[in-house]
Regions:
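Bacterial N-terminal signal peptides that target proteins for export
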Residues: 5-21
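Sec-dependent N-terminal signal peptides
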Residues: 20-28
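C-terminal motif of bacterial Sec signal peptides marking the signal peptidase cleavage site
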Residues: 30-32
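Zymogen propeptides
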Residues: 34-130, 203-204
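Active-site-adjacent helix-turn-beta-strand microarchitecture at beta-sheet edges
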Residues: 108-178
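Conserved, well-ordered active-site substructure
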Residues: 111-127, 186, 195, 199-208, ...
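Conserved beta-alpha junction segments in alpha/beta enzyme cores
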Residues: 168-192, 197
Length: 266
């Protein structure tokens, strides 16, 4: 397997390393976070070929929505956290949804917070991760309030620890309705933590998309904030709990590469 040589190299910036490890996807992904580009307003226009047919299913633990291009999950949560080291198990009935959050640097058998991209807060405790240039934004949560931050988010993440909350850095896709600079080559299943109409949700593409198209469809769905979430075989293992409390797997577990997960609790 090919490993990232230095912690300061973000896996997203050299995404071919992860792709080489899983041996399934050959597209080279290159993030252009350092380019001096201006945010672009999200287009609200729809072409005749891009219909938006919403299908909403409301359950006790979660509301599901979908369009032709997107699958949307609205967890009915009372609290949330960034769980690190060991992914929450389906036997923990307090968990209603879980998926990967920040990037993981190297493929290691032993867990360390330093292998998570960017400084982060888990269970109210502040941890230092490795520097990652692709992390252009962050998400923080404390006292049942959340916030998306674009750039200069270090103080906000530290404050989340002071307030016994959670927080992590990632690649910002949409901030206040504006598309942020993010240029990735190749089609992939994409996932993001989003805010739409004041509600928090997880949104995933239903088929492999260029990242620029995924962002476009998020905008058309009405997303005003979007932070990328880690994906790829070994990182995409995720699930939610249905009305009967039965776990529904979004992506089954294949490889143990993940290090951190955004976790919603009832």
């Amino acid at each position: 397997m090919v490993h990232a040589k230095k912690y300061y190299l973000c896996r997203m910036m050299s995404y071919q390393c992860k792709i080489g490890c899983i041996g399934l996807v050959t597209a080279l992904m290159i993030c252009s976070c350092n380019e001096q580009k201006q945010p672009h307003p999200m287009s609200s226009s729809l072409s005749s070929n891009d219909t938006m047919e919403d299908t909403i299913q409301i359950y006790h633990h979660i509301t599901l929505d979908s369009t032709e291009q997107l699958q949307i999950y609205y967890p009915h949560f009372k609290r949330m956290d960034l769980v690190c080291g060991a992914m929450p198990q389906p036997t923990d009935t307090s968990v209603i949804m879980v998926c990967a959050a920040a990037f993981t640097g190297q493929l290691k058998k032993e867990f360390s917070h330093e292998n998570i991209a960017g400084n982060h807060v888990s269970g109210g405790v502040y941890h230092k991760g490795y520097p990652c240039k692709a992390n252009t934004g962050a998400f923080v949560y404390a006292h049942r309030q959340w916030k998306f931050i674009y750039q200069d988010y270090a103080a906000e993440v530290a404050q989340a620890a002071d307030e016994s909350g959670m927080g992590f850095g990632q690649m910002m896709l949409i901030n206040n309705g504006l598309r942020m600079p993010a240029n990735v080559v190749g089609k992939n299943i994409c996932r993001a933590l989003c805010e739409r109409k004041g509600k928090l949700c997880i949104i995933e593409s239903r088929q492999p998309l260029l990242l620029i198209d995924f962002i476009k469809f998020l905008g058309r769905y009405g997303v005003t904030q979007a932070l990328y979430l880690d994906m790829g075989e070994g990182w995409n293992y995720s699930w939610y709990r249905d009305n009967q409390g039965i776990v529904q797997y979004i992506h089954p577990k294949t490889l143990d590469y993940g290090t951190n997960w955004i976790t919603f609790y009832r």
